[in-house]
């Protein structure tokens, strides 16, 4: 059997995409609508407290286009906690005016393709811990997409020897590193958790950097020959201060 890549796993992750029922929202009185907004802000305040304690992170973005209106990205130490947050949101009055559009369940992941030789416990390495248990940046823009490694004929990633996969991922990773300071990337593994194998979440203050990064990577063999990609979701940061105006109708 071919050698499988080993992974380091961090916080569990939920991407929850919702479409807003604007027609129903318009039927509410100003007072009712404000109560719903306040309830959602209370939920966000609880998430802020959790983030301040270093026990998780979150980000809220509006989505451009017809695939969804809002994306909630939640990181927590356990799958149970993700379920609790999802359930609490679904029980809120605000959720009555949303329709689930898409979701993605995964876990923050680092592979051993780029790892050096060391007997030290990687989970005690501050640099590794910062990547496995990240505080999500509140960048102006987000881009999310799921992906697989191709398994077709001669283009079967999983039949390549470990050394060849490691070398390919090294050159692939160098492209991503060249965007350091421009794009923050969170890779989450989802084999056995969702329909795709990985989720990729990109954060940037300049939305054009998403296009530049993804386009450049398409010419790298890892993407050009072995990459399969799902739908792309692009959006803009929604802060607590911006929520009242966003939901004003």
UniProtKB/Swiss-Prot annotation:
Active-site residues per Swiss-Prot or TrEMBL entry: 145
Cofactor note: Fe-coproporphyrin III acts both as a substrate and a redox cofactor.
Cofactor(s) for this UniProt protein: Fe-coproporphyrin III
Top enzyme category: oxidoreductase
InterPro entries: CHDC, ChdC/CLD, Dimeric_a/b-barrel
Catalysis performed (reactions): Fe-coproporphyrin III + 2 H2O2 + 2 H(+) = heme b + 2 CO2 + 4 H2O; Fe-coproporphyrin III + H2O2 + H(+) = harderoheme III + CO2 + 2 H2O; harderoheme III + H2O2 + H(+) = heme b + CO2 + 2 H2O
GO biological process, one term: heme B biosynthetic process
Disulphide bridges: none
Pathway info: Porphyrin-containing compound metabolism; protoheme biosynthesis
E.C. designation(s): 1.3.98.5
GO molecular function, one term: metal ion binding
Protein keywords: Heme, Heme biosynthesis, Iron, Metal-binding, Oxidoreductase
Binding site for Fe-coproporphyrin III: 131, 145-149, 172, 185, 223
Function according to Swiss-Prot or TrEMBL: Involved in coproporphyrin-dependent heme b biosynthesis. Catalyzes the decarboxylation of Fe-coproporphyrin III (coproheme) to heme b (protoheme IX), the last step of the pathway. The reaction occurs in a stepwise manner with a three-propionate intermediate.
Alphabetical list of NCBIfam families matching this protein: PRK12276.1
Family: Belongs to the ChdC family. Type 1 subfamily.
PANTHER family found in the cross-reference section: COPROHEME DECARBOXYLASE, HEME-DEPENDENT PEROXIDASE YWFI-RELATED
Protein name: Coproheme decarboxylase
Lineage of source species: Bacteria, Bacillati, Bacillota, Bacilli, Bacillales
